Amino acid sequence: GLPICGETCFTGTCNTPGCSCTYPICTRD
């Protein structure tokens, strides 16, 4: 889906549901 979750994942984790870390940003389908 939308590629940007509006979240970064410098710590390696994403807090936004449905998002995964593609360093250094969170992405989703």
From Swiss-Prot:
Domain notes: The presence of a 'disulfide through disulfide knot' structurally defines this protein as a knottin.
PTM info: This is a cyclic peptide.
Covalent link Cyclopeptide (Gly-Asp), residues: 1-29
Keywords: Disulfide bond, Knottin, Plant defense
Cysteine-cysteine disulfides: 5-19, 9-21, 14-26
Family designation: Belongs to the cyclotide family. Moebius subfamily.
GO annotation, biological process: defense response
Protein name: Cyclotide psyleio A
Highest taxon of the lineage: Eukaryota
Keyword ATP-binding: no
InterPro entries the record matches: Cyclotide (IPR005535), Cyclotide_moebius_CS (IPR012324), Cyclotide_sf (IPR036146)
Keyword presence, Disulfide bond: yes
Role summary: Probably participates in a plant defense mechanism.
